[in-house]
Regions:
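Cell-wall polysaccharide-cleaving catalytic domain and substrate-binding groove, primarily
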Residues: 1-157
């Protein structure tokens, strides 16, 4: 868990404070955005506070620990980037693409999803993640400037 959280923080730019007006998350530090965490003083956030937020808000609820080792980092990164509900839906869609719609795409981690992900290939999940980014950019052209970075982030996991 600690190692995966550290990787996410690194991918998110570490302690660099960003205030990009076109970023839907608003002010961000350690990957913790003001919009997703309105009760947090993001500008004065410490590394330990960020780690604690990742553990409580993302790691434990995501059940990433129940994913196969080869998918754990990718899945957790998706939960941070998209939110758990959307991340799970993307995982379920990737599973269904290969298994002919055996899972209900409901954004919930249940026993069927956990069993099905055991056979999901990392590259298949990467392709569904990149496709989701493309859909985001098609819906909001202003976010296109982030696409290459999102693509690169996905491919390096």
């Amino acid at each position: 868990m600690q190692n995966i959280i550290a990787k996410v923080i690194e991918r998110e730019g570490g302690d660099k404070l960003t205030k990009d007006p076109s970023d839907p998350g608003g002010t961000t530090k350690y990957g913790i955005s003001q919009r997703a965490n309105p009760d947090v003083d993001v500008e004065n956030l410490t590394l330990q506070q960020a780690i604690d937020i990742y553990k409580e808000k993302y790691w434990h609820p995501s059940r990433a620990v129940d994913f196969p080792k080869h998918l754990m980092d990718m899945y957790f990164d998706m939960c941070v980037n998209f939110g758990q509900f959307k991340a799970v839906k993307i995982v379920q869609e990737a599973v269904n693409h290969k298994s002919k719609n055996t899972l209900k795409v409901d954004g919930r981690i249940g026993p069927k999803t956990l069993a099905a992900v055991q056979n999901l290939e990392l590259n298949r999940l990467k392709s569904f993640r990149v496709t989701h980014y493309a859909k985001i950019c098609m819906a909001n052209k202003k976010l296109m400037k982030y696409y290459y970075g999102w693509f690169r982030r996905t491919m390096h996991i």
